[in-house]
């Protein structure tokens, strides 16, 4: 089908504001030598560590220093000009007649998912019980340095470009909802394309049209249907529902969730070392699936291998939880699934029953 005259570009305002602000900001670190009080600036921590190895015969150690991050932002006008150019650029690239910008609100349903608290590094001599990390969804980003102008950039998008703020979901969910609704309307005869414009890899699993501004050579993609996974060197690429299934098994370290967290911590507690389960392993589980039933059975079987019996764990809220493989799978489906409509949620147990993977509960 040829592109109709009426085309709307839907833009992730979170992503674009962050990108524009980062491009207009220099960063460095200040290392303060605690015993002497002397300070020295470095471009980054790697440069600082190289300095420790090569200067003064390596007599300095990292624990003798306090590190603080410093930011050197350009004027806010530079950020706003960049955003204006980015919007105009993507509209031209997809031949859009209009655009809509979406920004995440203060709340997010995924923050309520009772992910395990024990998202930790292994026990070691310095930390016999392991080192506790954040367990809440996306909490690993909590201490990351945010661009100085980020808040003002989002306010600009709202005031000058009519950006809408989401409720109880992230901007990428709202993009998915908008794109899915547009694709369904299109299949029913609507003479309009709705094109989510984002570099977010999760968008590859949404049934909609899609444009990645970072990869213009891919053009306007159509992620309809079951999709596929493809080996590309060391990486696995994919689209359609197969890409969602891939994420459900792999997890996402950027968003701070891993379906093997509970298993890995139990293995460490028992004195063992968990075996790695990366992209290639996930691909091997899903590569022969021919339809959705195959994929759901493969995912369920893998979760049952990880959690053959009901397990107990401590959530990030310090609650003791007891869950079986399906309940655990539900958590990670909730993390990975982008909403197709408001309050959209895949019920794992019902889906497995519908697919005939497990017997219907009475």
What annotation goes with each model-predicted range?
Residues 2-191, 197, 208-221:
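Noncatalytic, basic helical substrate-engagement surface that gates or grips nucleic-acid strands
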Residues 96, 123-361:
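Extended two-metal-dependent nuclease catalytic cores across DNA- and RNA-processing enzymes
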């Amino acid at each position: 089908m040829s592109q109709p005259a009426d085309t709307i570009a839907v833009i992730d305002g979170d992503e674009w504001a962050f990108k524009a602000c980062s491009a207009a900001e220099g960063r460095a670190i200040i290392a303060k030598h605690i015993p002497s009080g002397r300070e020295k600036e470095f471009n980054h921590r790697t440069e600082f560590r190289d300095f420790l190895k090569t200067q003064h015969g390596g007599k300095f150690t990292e624990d003798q220093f306090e590190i603080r991050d410093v930011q050197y932002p350009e004027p806010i006008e530079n950020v706003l000009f960049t955003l204006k150019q980015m919007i105009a650029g993507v509209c031209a690239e997809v031949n859009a007649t209009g655009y809509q910008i979406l920004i995440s609100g203060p709340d997010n349903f995924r923050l309520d998912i009772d992910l395990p608290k024990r998202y930790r590094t292994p026990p070691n001599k310095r930390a016999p019980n392991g080192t506790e990390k954040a367990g809440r969804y996306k909490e690993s980003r909590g201490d990351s340095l945010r661009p100085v102008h980020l808040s003002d950039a989002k306010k600009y998008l709202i005031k000058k470009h009519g950006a809408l703020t989401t409720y109880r979901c992230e901007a990428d969910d709202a993009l998915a909802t908008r794109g899915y609704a547009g694709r369904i309307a299109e299949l029913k005869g609507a003479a309009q394309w709705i094109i989510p414009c984002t570099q977010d890899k999760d968008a590859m699993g949404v049934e909609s049209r899609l444009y990645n501004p970072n990869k213009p050579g891919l053009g306007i993609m159509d992620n309809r249907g079951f999709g596929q996974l493809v080996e590309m060197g060391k990486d696995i690429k994919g689209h359609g529902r197969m890409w969602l299934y891939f994420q459900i098994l792999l997890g996402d370290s950027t968003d701070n969730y891993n379906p093997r967290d509970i298993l890995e911590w139990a293995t460490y507690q028992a004195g063992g070392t968990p075996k790695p389960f990366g992209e290639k392993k996930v691909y091997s589980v899903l590569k022969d699936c021919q339809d959705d039933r195959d994929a759901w059975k493969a995912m369920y079987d893998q979760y049952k291998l990880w959690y053959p019996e009901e397990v107990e764990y401590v959530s990030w809220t310090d609650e003791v939880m007891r869950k079986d493989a399906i309940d655990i799978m539900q958590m990670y489906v909730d993390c990975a699934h982008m909403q197709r409509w408001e309050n959209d949620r895949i019920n794992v147990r019902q889906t497995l029953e519908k697919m005939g993977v497990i017997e219907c509960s009475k």
